[in-house]
UniProtKB/Swiss-Prot annotation:
UniProt lineage: Bacteria, Pseudomonadati, Pseudomonadota, Gammaproteobacteria, Enterobacterales
Pfam families to which the protein is assigned, alphabetical: IspD
Protein name, per record: 2-C-methyl-D-erythritol 4-phosphate cytidylyltransferase
Family (UniProt): Belongs to the IspD/TarI cytidylyltransferase family. IspD subfamily.
UniProt KW Nucleotidyltransferase keyword: yes
NCBIfam families: ispD
Alphabetically ordered keywords of this record: Isoprene biosynthesis, Nucleotidyltransferase, Transferase
Originating organism: Salmonella arizonae (strain ATCC BAA-731 / CDC346-86 / RSK2980)
Associated pathway: Isoprenoid biosynthesis; isopentenyl diphosphate biosynthesis via DXP pathway; isopentenyl diphosphate from 1-deoxy-D-xylulose 5-phosphate: step 2/6
Gene3D superfamilies in the record: Spore Coat Polysaccharide Biosynthesis Protein SpsA, Chain A (3.90.550.10)
GO terms for biological process, alphabetical: isopentenyl diphosphate biosynthetic process, methylerythritol 4-phosphate pathway
Annotated site location: Transition state stabilizer: 20, 27
Molecular function per GO: 2-C-methyl-D-erythritol 4-phosphate cytidylyltransferase activity
Site positions per UniProt: Positions MEP for the nucleophilic attack: 157, 213
UniProt entry tagged with the keyword Signal: no
Length: 236
């Protein structure tokens, strides 16, 4: 069945290991409550009616995913990823070749709010480029001296934003920009950076700062707090 303009597919790169978590288990498979971080992240996407399919990109030797209920979900597709995030995203894009618009969401970002997701998806009505969820920088930012634990100078924060996910783009545009950036050896830290490299300027859609990525051990407790609070608010 051909995708409609309103239908959105999501790609969730989940092939990473996350060594900064200091655990043997990949961070996306750590549990918060009765679900893994990956399950929380994916369910937040599937909760929106426009998201019709989620492609989860795992490492070829991953045996954990098959044990999750997600493995049998009718809206889930699983594909093998590559060595780098961009390679995994490309693999995910290949699996949704008919999609008009795609979301890319971190596997270890479980605290996405539905209001933020709805605002991001709404930009497809008027944009040909897409955009990302982002949070304005609130702290004073310092640039360090190369190779030293010393301050080089203070960075003006007026126009600085923390890039979050999901990031939301026309599927063909993202595919073409990633293809060119990878071919030309550009440094791609997120999907938006591939579009920037090709001269596009994705929109910044302000999102909640509690949409954190679980990267370090202390992030796990914080994510659990945020998720528990959200569940209680939804039940109130």
């Amino acid at each position: 069945m051909a995708a409609t303009l309103l239908d959105v597919c999501a790609v969730v790169p989940a092939a990473g290991f996350g060594r900064r978590m200091q655990t043997e288990c990949p961070k996306q498979y750590l549990s918060i409550g009765n679900k893994t971080i990956l399950e929380h992240s994916v369910h937040a996407l599937l909760a929106h009616p426009r998201v019709t399919r989620v492609v989860i990109v795992i490492s070829p030797g991953d045996h954990r995913f098959a044990q999750l209920p997600l493995a049998n979900h009718p809206q889930i597709t699983v594909v093998d990823g590559g060595n780098e995030r961009a390679d995994s995203v490309m693999a995910g894009l290949q699996a949704v070749a008919q999609a008009k618009w795609v979301l890319v969401h971190d596997a270890a970002r479980p605290c996405l709010h539905q209001d933020d997701l709805a605002r991001l998806l709404a930009i497809s009505e008027n944009s040909r480029v897409g955009g990302i969820l982002a949070s304005p920088v609130r702290d004073t930012m310092k640039r360090g001296e190369p190779g030293k634990a010393a301050i080089a100078h203070t960075v003006e924060r007026a126009d600085l934003w923390h890039a979050l996910t999901p990031q939301f783009f026309p599927r063909e545009l993202l595919h073409d920009c990633l293809t060119r950036a990878l071919k030309e050896g550009a440094t791609i830290t997120d999907e938006a950076s591939a579009l920037e490299y090709c001269g596009f300027h994705p929109a910044l859609v302000e999102g909640r700062a509690d949409n954190i990525k679980v990267t370090r051990p202390e992030d796990l407790a914080l994510a659990e707090f945020y998720l528990t609070r959200t569940i209680h608010q939804e039940k109130a």
